[in-house]
């Protein structure tokens, strides 16, 4: 028990990177969509199209990341993992800092896409470090602590940014200049939290390659796909991950845009999503502790089922207090399902090929995110102006679009049950 409670310096440094990059993703979930809406409004973009354009930008970013996933995964298994991790980090942080320089909504989306690509690419290298940094018995806890402290730690720079944005006049700033400073603060926090990991991490597991041509990365992806099809327990798990994480990522990426499209109060939306971070912190730790007592597969099943219920609730969301309740519910399961999904894969793959398989996981995850974001964006655009009257409520086109996520969670649940059964049978042998 003592080993489980005490983290090594390297594990702490690894967790700290989650604290850094989570500040960016919190900004993506809160202030960035609202700032984009203001730029779009100034350019005369119709309000019914906000959610669609934001969704399309997120979809394009995930397509680019999915294409880069095989390259990042292959590079992560070679000796220069830390170097490529640093390059991805710098792309993401520089993109974050440059968001305030965008002259209009279209260029803003372009810079955002680059920042998102850097962020997501860095996670391939970061996640692949886990099997080297922690033992199998500790992976669930370390992974969960990464998300937990990421949620609570990211609140520190966010509160500073929120004060600047909500009260710019107090500091002699305009709304625009306050946002520029918020982007710079977040980028600096992200880089600062990464320094300990860059200093302490030294790659110990890698494969030797004869050359480093980029095309070999895609050939390796094809080889990995052929091999993983033979490893049915991994393949079915990745398929299930493709569907259920789709819903999770889509909810994270579009929560603020969804609330804003429904006409909810901006300040209330930001404070509600700040509440999500505080709720996610203890519940992420709780899931890490529960994984020591209960099967990881069972906890993932419970999380998927609860997320399905959350989406059903979101479909009928029409008021501010309901959004606050939604924020609490999401916070309860968001960190747990992400952390356990990461550590679940880490347990069923060979450590020396962690980069390869986590790169493949990233392709599946980002491909899913593309599907979810695009699905919501398309349905929202096709039903623009439509209203549905049910149970005495008037649901807008945004409510209708969100309902599409229910199917994805349902498919993910069925496939994960199959994958978990295969892994149990494999362990039993």
Q: Predicted segments — roles?
A:
Residues 67-80, 282-296, 380:
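Helix-to-loop junctions at the C-terminal end of transmembrane segments
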Residues 189-200, 402-429:
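Multi-pass alpha-helical transporter architecture, strongest
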Residues 100-112, 315-327:
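Helix-loop junctions at membrane interfaces in 12-TM secondary transporters
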Residues 47-48, 165-188, 378-409:
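A membrane-interface helix-boundary motif in multi-pass transporters
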Residues 5-62, 233-272:
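Helix-loop boundary and gating motifs at the non-cytosolic
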Residues 83-98, 298-313:
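Structural signature of the two symmetry-related core transmembrane helices
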């Amino acid at each position: 028990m003592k080993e489980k409670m005490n983290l090594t310096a390297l594990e702490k440094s690894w967790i700290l990177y989650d604290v850094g990059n989570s500040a960016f993703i919190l900004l993506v979930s809160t202030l960035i969509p609202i700032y984009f809406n203001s730029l779009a409004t100034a350019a005369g973009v119709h309000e019914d199209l906000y959610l669609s354009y934001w969704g399309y930008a997120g979809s394009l970013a995930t397509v680019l990341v999915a294409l880069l996933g095989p390259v990042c995964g292959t590079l992560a298994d070679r000796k220069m993992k830390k170097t490529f991790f640093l390059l991805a980090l710098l792309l993401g942080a520089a993109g974050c800092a440059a968001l305030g320089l965008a002259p209009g909504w279209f260029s803003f989306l372009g810079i955002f896409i680059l920042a998102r690509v850097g962020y997501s690419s860095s996670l391939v290298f970061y996640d692949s470090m886990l099997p080297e940094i922690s033992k199998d018995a500790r992976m669930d806890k370390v992974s969960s602590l990464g998300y937990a402290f990421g949620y609570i730690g990211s609140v520190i720079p966010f509160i500073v940014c929120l004060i600047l944005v909500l009260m710019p006049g107090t500091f002699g700033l305009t709304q625009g200049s306050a946002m520029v400073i918020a982007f710079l603060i977040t980028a600096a926090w992200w880089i600062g939290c990464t320094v300990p990991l860059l200093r302490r991490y030294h790659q110990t597991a890698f494969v030797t390659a004869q050359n480093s041509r980029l095309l070999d990365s895609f050939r390796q992806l094809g080889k990995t796909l052929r091999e993983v099809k033979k490893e049915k327990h991994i393949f079915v798990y990745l398929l299930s991950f493709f569907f259920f994480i789709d819903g999770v990522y889509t909810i994270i990426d579009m929560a603020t845009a969804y609330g804003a499209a429904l006409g909810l109060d901006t300040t209330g939306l930001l404070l509600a999503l700040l509440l999500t971070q505080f709720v996610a912190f203890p519940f992420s730790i709780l899931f890490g502790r529960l994984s020591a007592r209960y099967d990881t597969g069972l906890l993932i099943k419970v999380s998927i089922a609860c997320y399905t219920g959350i989406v059903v609730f979101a479909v009928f969301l029409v008021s501010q207090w309901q959004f606050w309740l939604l924020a609490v519910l999401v916070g309860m399961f968001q960190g747990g399902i992400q952390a356990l999904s990461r550590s679940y894969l880490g347990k069923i793959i060979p450590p020396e090929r962690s980069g390869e398989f986590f790169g493949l996981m990233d392709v599946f995850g980002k491909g899913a995110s593309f599907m979810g974001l695009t699905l919501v964006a398309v349905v929202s655009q096709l039903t623009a102006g439509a209203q549905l009257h049910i149970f005495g409520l008037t649901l807008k086109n945004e409510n209708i679009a969100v309902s599409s996520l229910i199917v994805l969670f349902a498919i993910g649940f069925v496939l994960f049950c199959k994958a978990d059964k295969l892994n149990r049978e494999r362990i039993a042998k």
